[in-house]
């Protein structure tokens, strides 16, 4: 999909013609790996995975607007840009920063709703994977929030400080993060 980038007219166009193939199918695959808490919950687990895939991908788009444009890609829906007064995205144009901030905050709210949907059905997943999925929702949800509340616009690539990442884990799991770095 990135080999021949094209603009996406609406959020629905973006989700169905890009996000589905880049993130949602990964969530579906992982749902088969992780499993559901019971066979009857598998559909809910798939719905949660779909919501999480969309939320994660939207957050990544919001974080990387300037970098994506440098690579010839624009993942912000064209209709939202036009509604904010941007006819053609130019991430370097200081005159567009306010309008881009409006679009970013709007899409961040959309992503926030998808994170909430993913969290609502977290119990549909097998118990042994819920902690990892919950941590993912919380860390990326925090990144999404930082992007939405940033006064620096797209000139700064937001991230979540390590302390905030640790805060979403139970203390009994802290040792796993340094171990992951040591075993690379």
What positions do the PLM features span?
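Catalytic cores of Mg2+-dependent Asp-rich isoprenoid enzymes
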Residues: 1-55, 62, 67-184
């Amino acid at each position: 999909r990135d080999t021949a980038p094209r603009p996406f007219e609406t959020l629905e166009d973006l989700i169905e013609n890009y996000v589905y193939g880049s993130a949602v199918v990964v969530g579906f695959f992982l749902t088969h790996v992780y499993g559901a808490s019971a066979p009857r919950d598998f559909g809910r687990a798939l719905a949660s995975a779909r919501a999480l895939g969309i939320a994660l991908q939207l957050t990544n788009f919001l974080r990387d607007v300037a970098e994506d444009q440098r690579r010839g890609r624009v993942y912000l829906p064209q209709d939202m840009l036009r509604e904010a007064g941007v006819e053609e995205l130019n991430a370097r144009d200081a005159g567009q920063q306010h309008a881009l901030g409006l679009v970013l905050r709007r899409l961040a709210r959309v992503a926030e709703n998808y994170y909430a949907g993913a969290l609502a059905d977290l119990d549909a997943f097998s118990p042994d994977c819920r902690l990892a999925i919950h941590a993912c929702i919380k860390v990326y949800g925090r990144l999404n929030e930082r992007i939405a509340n940033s006064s620096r616009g797209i000139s700064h690539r937001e991230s979540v400080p390590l302390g905030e990442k640790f805060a979403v884990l139970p203390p009994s799991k802290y040792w796993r993060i340094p171990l992951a770095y040591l075993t690379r």
